Amino acid sequence: MAQPSMSLTLKRLESDDASRSLQDMDPLNDSSNDNNILGIDEPLKLKSKKRIAKVDNERVLNKPQGLPYLIKNHHRLGRIVEQRDKKFAKQELRKLQSIHHSYKTPRQLKYDHEVETLGSILHFYQLWCHGMFPKANFKDCAYLVRNLGHRSSQLRLYRRELIEKEIFKLKVSKGIIDESSEVATRESESDGFTNTRSGNNDDSGDIFVSTGDNVYQNQMEFSGAQGQELPSPTLSEQATEQMERNDAAVSAVAAADDEYDDDWSFMNLELGIDAAPAPPSSSSSLPLSKSSNGLLNGSDKNNAETGTANREQYNNFDYENEIQNENENEIENEDDIDLAMELMREHDNI
Protein backbone atom coordinates (compact mmCIF):
# COMPACT_ATOMS: atom_id res chain seq x y z
CA MET A 1 0.00 0.00 0.00
CA ALA A 2 2.98 2.33 0.42
CA GLN A 3 3.96 2.29 -3.25
CA PRO A 4 0.64 3.76 -4.62
CA SER A 5 0.68 6.52 -2.03
CA MET A 6 4.23 7.48 -2.98
CA SER A 7 3.32 7.65 -6.65
CA LEU A 8 0.33 9.89 -5.93
CA THR A 9 2.42 12.30 -3.87
CA LEU A 10 5.03 12.48 -6.63
CA LYS A 11 2.34 13.30 -9.22
CA ARG A 12 0.92 16.03 -6.99
CA LEU A 13 4.35 17.58 -6.51
CA GLU A 14 5.02 17.56 -10.22
CA SER A 15 1.65 19.20 -10.99
CA ASP A 16 2.29 21.89 -8.34
CA ASP A 17 5.72 22.65 -9.75
CA ALA A 18 4.30 22.93 -13.29
CA SER A 19 1.56 25.32 -12.19
CA ARG A 20 4.06 27.47 -10.30
CA SER A 21 6.36 27.66 -13.28
CA LEU A 22 3.45 28.73 -15.52
CA GLN A 23 2.45 31.42 -13.03
CA ASP A 24 6.01 32.71 -12.87
CA MET A 25 6.18 32.89 -16.65
CA ASP A 26 2.89 34.82 -16.99
CA PRO A 27 3.59 38.61 -16.65
CA LEU A 28 -0.06 39.37 -15.89
CA ASN A 29 0.16 37.51 -12.56
CA ASP A 30 3.22 39.49 -11.46
CA SER A 31 2.04 42.21 -9.08
CA SER A 32 5.30 44.13 -9.40
CA ASN A 33 4.86 44.61 -13.15
CA ASP A 34 1.22 45.73 -13.10
CA ASN A 35 2.11 49.36 -13.74
CA ASN A 36 4.72 48.66 -16.44
CA ILE A 37 2.57 46.57 -18.76
CA LEU A 38 1.99 49.47 -21.20
CA GLY A 39 5.41 50.99 -20.66
CA ILE A 40 4.03 54.07 -18.93
CA ASP A 41 6.76 54.30 -16.29
CA GLU A 42 9.59 53.73 -18.75
CA PRO A 43 11.63 56.84 -19.61
CA LEU A 44 11.05 58.24 -23.09
CA LYS A 45 13.95 58.62 -25.47
CA LEU A 46 13.51 61.50 -27.91
CA LYS A 47 15.34 61.09 -31.19
CA SER A 48 15.75 63.63 -33.94
CA LYS A 49 13.97 62.80 -37.19
CA LYS A 50 16.26 61.54 -39.85
CA ARG A 51 16.28 63.88 -42.82
CA ILE A 52 15.84 62.37 -46.24
CA ALA A 53 17.86 63.97 -48.97
CA LYS A 54 15.69 64.89 -51.96
CA VAL A 55 15.60 67.30 -54.87
CA ASP A 56 13.10 70.04 -54.01
CA ASN A 57 12.56 73.75 -54.63
CA GLU A 58 14.82 74.69 -51.74
CA ARG A 59 17.74 72.72 -53.14
CA VAL A 60 17.27 73.78 -56.76
CA LEU A 61 16.27 77.46 -56.46
CA ASN A 62 17.76 78.80 -53.23
CA LYS A 63 21.05 77.01 -52.74
CA PRO A 64 24.09 78.32 -54.65
CA GLN A 65 24.76 74.82 -56.03
CA GLY A 66 21.38 74.77 -57.80
CA LEU A 67 20.16 76.89 -60.69
CA PRO A 68 22.13 79.98 -59.57
CA TYR A 69 25.32 78.06 -60.40
CA LEU A 70 24.09 77.29 -63.92
CA ILE A 71 22.95 80.86 -64.56
CA LYS A 72 26.28 82.20 -63.35
CA ASN A 73 28.57 79.82 -65.27
CA HIS A 74 26.71 78.77 -68.42
CA HIS A 75 28.37 81.54 -70.47
CA ARG A 76 31.74 79.93 -69.74
CA LEU A 77 30.55 76.72 -71.31
CA GLY A 78 29.46 78.58 -74.44
CA ARG A 79 32.82 80.31 -74.59
CA ILE A 80 34.65 76.98 -74.40
CA VAL A 81 32.53 75.56 -77.23
CA GLU A 82 33.24 78.62 -79.41
CA GLN A 83 36.98 78.34 -78.76
CA ARG A 84 36.99 74.68 -79.77
CA ASP A 85 35.06 75.42 -82.95
CA LYS A 86 37.48 78.19 -83.91
CA LYS A 87 40.46 75.94 -83.23
CA PHE A 88 38.99 73.16 -85.35
CA ALA A 89 38.25 75.61 -88.19
CA LYS A 90 41.84 76.91 -88.13
CA GLN A 91 43.24 73.39 -88.31
CA GLU A 92 41.08 72.54 -91.30
CA LEU A 93 42.05 75.81 -93.00
CA ARG A 94 45.75 75.00 -92.60
CA LYS A 95 45.17 71.57 -94.11
CA LEU A 96 43.32 73.14 -97.01
CA GLN A 97 46.14 75.60 -97.70
CA SER A 98 48.99 73.13 -97.28
CA ILE A 99 47.64 69.93 -98.83
CA HIS A 100 45.40 70.87 -101.72
CA HIS A 101 42.75 73.41 -102.55
CA SER A 102 40.18 70.70 -103.13
CA TYR A 103 40.58 69.30 -99.63
CA LYS A 104 37.34 68.53 -97.76
CA THR A 105 37.02 67.76 -94.08
CA PRO A 106 36.20 64.07 -93.57
CA ARG A 107 32.80 63.39 -92.11
CA GLN A 108 34.21 61.20 -89.36
CA LEU A 109 36.50 64.02 -88.25
CA LYS A 110 33.51 66.34 -87.93
CA TYR A 111 31.67 63.74 -85.88
CA ASP A 112 34.67 63.31 -83.58
CA HIS A 113 34.81 67.06 -83.00
CA GLU A 114 31.09 67.16 -82.15
CA VAL A 115 31.48 64.21 -79.77
CA GLU A 116 34.26 66.02 -77.91
CA THR A 117 32.11 69.14 -77.62
CA LEU A 118 29.14 67.17 -76.27
CA GLY A 119 31.45 65.38 -73.84
CA SER A 120 32.59 68.69 -72.36
CA ILE A 121 28.97 69.83 -72.03
CA LEU A 122 27.99 66.61 -70.26
CA HIS A 123 31.00 66.90 -67.97
CA PHE A 124 29.88 70.41 -66.96
CA TYR A 125 26.40 69.18 -66.04
CA GLN A 126 27.80 66.12 -64.25
CA LEU A 127 29.84 68.36 -61.98
CA TRP A 128 26.77 70.52 -61.35
CA CYS A 129 24.61 67.51 -60.40
CA HIS A 130 27.31 66.11 -58.13
CA GLY A 131 27.64 69.43 -56.30
CA MET A 132 23.88 69.86 -55.93
CA PHE A 133 22.90 66.26 -55.05
CA PRO A 134 25.97 64.09 -54.32
CA LYS A 135 24.00 60.95 -53.33
CA ALA A 136 22.71 60.30 -56.85
CA ASN A 137 24.55 59.60 -60.06
CA PHE A 138 24.10 61.81 -63.10
CA LYS A 139 21.28 59.78 -64.68
CA ASP A 140 19.21 59.63 -61.48
CA CYS A 141 19.83 63.31 -60.74
CA ALA A 142 18.64 64.31 -64.22
CA TYR A 143 15.51 62.18 -63.72
CA LEU A 144 14.77 63.81 -60.34
CA VAL A 145 15.28 67.34 -61.69
CA ARG A 146 13.01 66.60 -64.67
CA ASN A 147 10.23 65.31 -62.40
CA LEU A 148 10.56 68.37 -60.18
CA GLY A 149 10.20 70.59 -63.25
CA HIS A 150 6.89 68.89 -64.07
CA ARG A 151 5.52 69.03 -60.52
CA SER A 152 6.70 72.38 -59.13
CA SER A 153 4.64 75.42 -60.15
CA GLN A 154 7.32 77.73 -58.73
CA LEU A 155 9.97 76.21 -60.98
CA ARG A 156 7.69 76.42 -64.02
CA LEU A 157 7.07 80.13 -63.35
CA TYR A 158 10.79 80.74 -62.93
CA ARG A 159 11.51 78.97 -66.22
CA ARG A 160 8.83 81.01 -68.02
CA GLU A 161 10.41 84.25 -66.77
CA LEU A 162 13.82 83.18 -68.08
CA ILE A 163 12.34 82.34 -71.50
CA GLU A 164 10.55 85.70 -71.69
CA LYS A 165 13.77 87.53 -70.87
CA GLU A 166 15.63 85.73 -73.65
CA ILE A 167 12.83 86.50 -76.13
CA PHE A 168 12.95 90.17 -75.12
CA LYS A 169 16.71 90.25 -75.71
CA LEU A 170 16.29 88.73 -79.18
CA LYS A 171 13.61 91.28 -80.10
CA VAL A 172 15.83 94.14 -78.96
CA SER A 173 18.84 92.79 -80.86
CA LYS A 174 16.83 92.43 -84.08
CA GLY A 175 15.32 95.91 -83.78
CA ILE A 176 11.72 94.77 -83.42
CA ILE A 177 11.16 96.81 -80.25
CA ASP A 178 12.97 99.62 -78.49
CA GLU A 179 14.43 98.67 -75.13
CA SER A 180 14.05 102.08 -73.47
CA SER A 181 10.40 102.51 -74.48
CA GLU A 182 9.58 98.94 -73.45
CA VAL A 183 11.12 99.46 -70.01
CA ALA A 184 9.17 102.72 -69.58
CA THR A 185 5.98 100.95 -70.63
CA ARG A 186 6.46 98.18 -68.09
CA GLU A 187 7.20 100.67 -65.31
CA SER A 188 4.11 102.74 -66.13
CA GLU A 189 1.95 99.62 -66.25
CA SER A 190 3.25 98.47 -62.87
CA ASP A 191 2.64 101.94 -61.38
CA GLY A 192 -0.87 102.07 -62.80
CA PHE A 193 -1.61 98.61 -61.43
CA THR A 194 -0.47 99.55 -57.92
CA ASN A 195 -2.47 102.79 -58.04
CA THR A 196 -5.53 100.89 -59.20
CA ARG A 197 -5.25 98.45 -56.30
CA SER A 198 -4.80 101.29 -53.81
CA GLY A 199 -7.75 103.22 -55.32
CA ASN A 200 -10.05 100.25 -54.98
CA ASN A 201 -9.47 99.97 -51.22
CA ASP A 202 -12.51 101.05 -49.21
CA ASP A 203 -13.03 101.79 -45.53
CA SER A 204 -13.71 98.14 -44.77
CA GLY A 205 -10.05 97.28 -45.34
CA ASP A 206 -10.61 95.15 -48.43
CA ILE A 207 -7.35 95.20 -50.37
CA PHE A 208 -8.58 93.07 -53.26
CA VAL A 209 -10.04 94.30 -56.53
CA SER A 210 -13.83 94.51 -56.47
CA THR A 211 -15.75 91.69 -58.13
CA GLY A 212 -16.41 92.20 -61.82
CA ASP A 213 -13.81 94.97 -62.26
CA ASN A 214 -11.26 94.61 -64.99
CA VAL A 215 -7.79 95.58 -63.88
CA TYR A 216 -6.80 96.87 -67.29
CA GLN A 217 -10.03 98.91 -67.57
CA ASN A 218 -9.41 100.45 -64.15
CA GLN A 219 -5.88 101.24 -65.23
CA MET A 220 -7.16 103.05 -68.35
CA GLU A 221 -9.71 105.02 -66.32
CA PHE A 222 -7.07 106.05 -63.81
CA SER A 223 -4.65 107.23 -66.50
CA GLY A 224 -7.48 109.07 -68.32
CA ALA A 225 -8.48 110.84 -65.12
CA GLN A 226 -4.93 112.11 -64.72
CA GLY A 227 -4.93 113.36 -68.31
CA GLN A 228 -2.31 110.85 -69.43
CA GLU A 229 -2.32 108.00 -71.91
CA LEU A 230 -0.67 104.66 -71.50
CA PRO A 231 2.50 104.51 -73.61
CA SER A 232 2.54 101.79 -76.21
CA PRO A 233 5.65 99.88 -77.26
CA THR A 234 7.22 101.68 -80.23
CA LEU A 235 8.22 99.66 -83.26
CA SER A 236 10.98 100.38 -85.70
CA GLU A 237 10.17 101.71 -89.17
CA GLN A 238 11.08 98.42 -90.80
CA ALA A 239 8.81 96.45 -88.48
CA THR A 240 5.98 98.96 -89.02
CA GLU A 241 6.26 98.69 -92.80
CA GLN A 242 6.29 94.91 -92.58
CA MET A 243 3.14 94.95 -90.45
CA GLU A 244 1.40 97.29 -92.92
CA ARG A 245 2.31 95.02 -95.84
CA ASN A 246 0.99 91.99 -93.97
CA ASP A 247 -2.28 93.78 -93.16
CA ALA A 248 -2.70 94.83 -96.80
CA ALA A 249 -2.13 91.27 -98.01
CA VAL A 250 -4.62 89.88 -95.49
CA SER A 251 -7.26 92.45 -96.45
CA ALA A 252 -6.78 91.68 -100.17
CA VAL A 253 -7.26 87.97 -99.58
CA ALA A 254 -10.35 88.65 -97.44
CA ALA A 255 -11.85 90.91 -100.13
CA ALA A 256 -11.29 88.25 -102.79
CA ASP A 257 -12.98 85.66 -100.60
CA ASP A 258 -15.95 87.97 -99.99
CA GLU A 259 -16.32 88.66 -103.71
CA TYR A 260 -16.27 84.94 -104.43
CA ASP A 261 -18.83 84.27 -101.70
CA ASP A 262 -21.17 86.99 -103.02
CA ASP A 263 -21.23 85.49 -106.53
CA TRP A 264 -24.49 83.51 -106.64
CA SER A 265 -24.87 83.47 -110.43
CA PHE A 266 -24.42 79.72 -110.56
CA MET A 267 -27.70 79.35 -108.62
CA ASN A 268 -29.80 81.12 -111.35
CA LEU A 269 -30.54 77.97 -113.29
CA GLU A 270 -34.16 78.88 -113.99
CA LEU A 271 -35.16 82.52 -114.06
CA GLY A 272 -38.69 83.42 -113.03
CA ILE A 273 -41.28 85.04 -115.27
CA ASP A 274 -40.97 88.40 -113.53
CA ALA A 275 -37.18 88.40 -113.67
CA ALA A 276 -35.59 91.13 -115.76
CA PRO A 277 -34.02 89.94 -119.04
CA ALA A 278 -30.29 90.15 -119.51
CA PRO A 279 -29.03 93.20 -121.48
CA PRO A 280 -28.52 92.44 -125.19
CA SER A 281 -24.95 92.12 -126.35
CA SER A 282 -23.09 91.16 -129.48
CA SER A 283 -22.68 87.61 -128.29
CA SER A 284 -26.38 87.21 -127.47
CA SER A 285 -27.70 88.55 -130.82
CA LEU A 286 -27.32 85.14 -132.49
CA PRO A 287 -29.44 82.08 -131.75
CA LEU A 288 -27.87 79.89 -129.12
CA SER A 289 -27.31 76.19 -129.61
CA LYS A 290 -26.25 73.36 -127.38
CA SER A 291 -22.95 74.29 -125.73
CA SER A 292 -20.04 72.07 -124.85
CA ASN A 293 -21.04 71.84 -121.20
CA GLY A 294 -24.43 70.27 -122.01
CA LEU A 295 -26.65 73.41 -121.75
CA LEU A 296 -29.48 73.76 -124.32
CA ASN A 297 -30.24 77.40 -125.08
CA GLY A 298 -33.02 78.06 -127.62
CA SER A 299 -33.80 81.29 -129.47
CA ASP A 300 -36.63 83.53 -128.34
CA LYS A 301 -39.89 82.27 -129.86
CA ASN A 302 -41.71 85.54 -129.14
CA ASN A 303 -39.13 87.69 -130.95
CA ALA A 304 -37.61 85.70 -133.78
CA GLU A 305 -36.26 88.75 -135.60
CA THR A 306 -33.78 89.74 -132.91
CA GLY A 307 -32.88 86.18 -132.00
CA THR A 308 -32.15 87.06 -128.38
CA ALA A 309 -31.71 84.36 -125.80
CA ASN A 310 -34.84 82.87 -124.28
CA ARG A 311 -35.51 83.40 -120.61
CA GLU A 312 -36.26 79.72 -120.07
CA GLN A 313 -33.14 77.57 -120.02
CA TYR A 314 -33.35 73.80 -120.11
CA ASN A 315 -30.44 72.03 -118.50
CA ASN A 316 -29.29 68.68 -119.74
CA PHE A 317 -26.22 67.66 -117.74
CA ASP A 318 -23.89 64.81 -118.63
CA TYR A 319 -24.64 62.77 -115.51
CA GLU A 320 -28.37 62.71 -116.42
CA ASN A 321 -27.52 61.16 -119.79
CA GLU A 322 -25.36 58.57 -118.08
CA ILE A 323 -28.17 57.64 -115.69
CA GLN A 324 -30.62 57.35 -118.57
CA ASN A 325 -28.24 55.10 -120.51
CA GLU A 326 -27.75 52.87 -117.48
CA ASN A 327 -31.51 52.51 -117.02
CA GLU A 328 -31.94 51.56 -120.70
CA ASN A 329 -29.17 48.95 -120.38
CA GLU A 330 -30.84 47.47 -117.30
CA ILE A 331 -34.16 47.20 -119.16
CA GLU A 332 -32.48 45.44 -122.10
CA ASN A 333 -30.74 43.03 -119.73
CA GLU A 334 -34.04 42.22 -118.03
CA ASP A 335 -35.64 41.48 -121.43
CA ASP A 336 -32.77 39.14 -122.31
CA ILE A 337 -33.12 37.34 -118.98
CA ASP A 338 -36.88 36.88 -119.46
CA LEU A 339 -36.32 35.49 -122.96
CA ALA A 340 -33.72 33.03 -121.67
CA MET A 341 -36.06 31.86 -118.90
CA GLU A 342 -38.85 31.21 -121.42
CA LEU A 343 -36.49 29.17 -123.62
CA MET A 344 -35.42 27.10 -120.61
CA ARG A 345 -39.05 26.38 -119.68
CA GLU A 346 -39.84 25.28 -123.25
CA HIS A 347 -36.80 23.00 -123.24
CA ASP A 348 -37.89 21.45 -119.95
CA ASN A 349 -41.40 20.82 -121.24
CA ILE A 350 -40.02 19.06 -124.30
Curated annotation (Swiss-Prot):
It comes from the Eukaryota. Residues 191-202, 223-241, 300-315 have a biased composition (Polar residues). InterPro entries: Csm3, TIPIN/Csm3/Swi3. GO terms for molecular function: DNA binding. The keyword Signal does not apply. Keywords: Cell cycle, DNA damage, DNA repair, DNA replication inhibitor, Meiosis, Nucleus. GO terms for biological process: DNA repair; DNA replication checkpoint signaling; meiotic cell cycle; replication fork arrest; replication fork processing. It is found in: Nucleus. GO terms for cellular component: replication fork protection complex. Residues 1-39, 183-205, 223-248, 277-315 are annotated as: Disordered. Component of the fork protection complex (FPC) consisting of TOF1 and CSM3. Belongs to the CSM3 family. This is Chromosome segregation in meiosis protein 3. The lineage of its organism: Eukaryota, Fungi, Dikarya, Ascomycota, Saccharomycotina.
